[in-house]
Curated annotation (Swiss-Prot):
Gene3D superfamilies: TolB, C-terminal domain. Pfam families: MRJP (PF03022). Is present in royal jelly in different forms: monomer (55 kDa), oligomeric subunit (ca. 287-420 kDa), and water-insoluble aggregates in sediment after interaction with fatty acids. Component of the apisin heterooligomer complex consisting of 4 copies of MRJP1 and 4 copies of apisimin, associated with 8 molecules of 24-methylenecholesterol; apisimin forms a bridge connecting two MRJP1 dimers. At low pH multiple apisin octamers stack to form filaments that increase the viscosity of royal jelly; these filaments may be stabilized by bound fatty acid chains. It comes from Apis mellifera (Honeybee). Found in and secreted from the hypopharyngeal glands of the worker honey bee (at protein level); expression peaks at 12 days post eclosion. Expressed in the brains of worker bees (at protein level); found in antennal lobe, optical lobe and a subpopulation of Kenyon cells in the mushroom body. Found in the ommatidia of worker bees (at protein level). Expressed in the spermatheca of adult queen bees (at protein level); expression levels are higher in mated queens than in virgin queens. Expressed in queen bee ovaries and male drone testes. This is Major royal jelly protein 1. It is found in: Secreted; Cytoplasm; Cell projection, Rhabdomere; Cytoplasm, Cytoskeleton. Glycans are attached at residues 28, 144, 177. Optimum pH for protein stability is 4.0. Protein becomes unstable at pH above 9.0. Belongs to the major royal jelly protein family. The modification Leucine amide is found at residue 432. Transmembrane segments: none annotated. Keywords: Amidation, Antibiotic, Antimicrobial, Cell projection, Cytoplasm, Cytoskeleton, Developmental protein, Disulfide bond, Fungicide, Glycoprotein, Secreted, Signal. The modification Histidine amide is found at residue 431. The gene is Mrjp1.
Length: 432
């Protein structure tokens, strides 16, 4: 194995050497399936209402693709990109089951599924639940993932009451690249430091088409758009191949994840094998300047493109490995080098494009006295993105899955475990 040299200082992004990422001892461990679907259907309230939706084109099962998931208590949220035939973009999984799988129920109700006057949710591309029991929803405003229908916006719900707390439009000059005119808001990370005040909540939004990072301050509703060459896609890696089927993606920064331990925001361009991060301490004040922001990372450290990312409270970064249909990890207590990266799960059947991951605490079925030992579990959504892009789903097969696994068990006996002799997180050089 070739050891990767990396310099993390002076704002330098380093070049990685080649060599395969090691596969962990738990590679063949399958992720338990929580829910699965051949296709998505909804709880319309009555058969008559469902038939009306089908006849009018409001619902077409062939055009419903999940983009994100999250869980709060017994509610599991599923967002659907708004294509023609998608009746609701923000949903929860109901207790009813249809021919395709569990039925979806619009959240908080059907009124938010209507968007003709732009008052509802057009396309909930991503969502996040913070420690204050708030649901943050990123609405791209796009139909068919390309056509602007309404201005993009950020919505916040109180999960204890299901009431809308706030809705903020994202200005056009922030939401799109001023030079290219391109924009598609595709990833979301929320940093809530103090639940008693609004001033300590910041939101990070990735624009994968316009190759930009947007920082939102909840205290004054200010938006800042940042640019960096680390956000740009790499032309060498625009071909995405999953289970032998390929498509092209000329997309930049996406798949963001915020570390609760180091406050690093991790990301990768869609078309890239690199892994980058920026420390969010630099954004705490609203008077920061673009040229003062320092980005770190390693170019071409992965063997394939990466997708969704998430960081556990103990500092384990998980990421989807697109071409391998696998789940990779790296521990922030170790240096960001290739030999410290592991593949901990792989399945050509169930892990075709990991589209979303979330870290939650205490598996619901774990006895209360064991939850302090096995605190964290990971939720994983796979959605066969290649089938969506190429429009060749077989809806007689299972196409979409939500899986979960205990974090400690997943990384057991791999380098993603915390080193016994070092409990200090990987040090970062920050220049403010």
């Amino acid at each position: 194995m070739t050891r990767l040299f990396m310099l993390v200082c002076l704002g330098i992004v380093c070049q990685g050497t080649t060599g395969n990422i090691l596969r962990g001892e738990s590679l063949n461990k399958s992720l338990p399936i929580l829910h699965e679907w051949k296709f998505f259907d909804y709880d319309f309230g009555s058969d008559e209402r469902r038939q009306d939706a089908i006849l009018s084109g409001e619902y077409d099962y062939k055009n419903n693709y999940p983009s994100d998931i999250d869980q709060w208590h017994d509610k599991i949220f599923v967002t659907m990109l708004r294509y023609n035939g998608v009746p609701s973009s923000l949903n929860v999984i109901s207790k009813k089951v249809g021919d395709g799988g569990p039925l979806l129920q619009p959240y908080p109700d059907w009124s938010f599924a209507k968007y003709d006057d732009c008052s509802g949710i057009v396309s909930a591309s991503k969502l996040a639940i913070d420690k204050c029991d708030r649901l943050w929803v990123l609405d791209s405003g796009l139909v068919n993932n390309t056509q602007p229908m309404c201005s993009p916006k950020l919505l916040t719900f109180d999960l204890t009451t299901s009431q809308l707390l706030k809705q903020v439009e994202i200005p056009h000059d922030v939401a799109v690249n001023a030079t290219t005119g391109k924009g598609r808001l595709s990833s979301l990370a929320v940093q809530s430091l103090d639940c008693n005040t609004n001033s300590d909540t910041m939101v990070y939004i990735a624009d994968e088409k316009g190759e930009g990072l947007i920082v939102y301050h909840n205290s004054d509703d200010s938006f800042h758009r940042l640019t960096s060459n680390t956000f740009d896609y790499d032309p060498k890696f625009t071909k995405m191949t999953i289970d032998g089927e390929s498509y092209t993606a000329q997309d930049g920064i996406s798949g963001m994840a915020l570390s609760p331990m180091t406050n690093n925001l991790y990301y990768s361009p869609v078309a890239s094998t690199s892994l980058y991060y920026v420390n969010t301490e630099q954004f705490r004040t609203s008077d920061y300047q673009q040229n003062d922001i320092h980005y770190e990372g390693v170019q071409n450290i992965l063997d394939t493109q990466s997708s969704a990312k998430v960081v556990s409270k103990s500092g384990v970064l998980f990421f989807g490995l697109v071409g391998d249909s696998a789940l990779g990890c790296w521990n922030e207590h170790r240096t960001l080098e290739r030999h410290n990266i592991r593949t901990v799960a792989q399945s050509d059947e169930t892990l075709q494009m990991i589209a979303s991951m979330k870290i939650k605490e205490a598996l619901p079925h774990v006895p209360i006295f064991d939850r302090y030992i096995n605190r964290e579990y990971i939720l994983v959504l796979s959605n066969k993105m290649q089938k969506m892009v190429n429009n060749d789903f077989n809806f007689d097969d299972v196409n979409f899955r939500i899986m979960n696994a205990n974090v400690n068990e997943l990384i057991l006996n791999t380098r993603c475990e915390n080193p016994d002799n070092d409990r200090t997180p990987f040090k970062i050089s920050i220049h403010l």
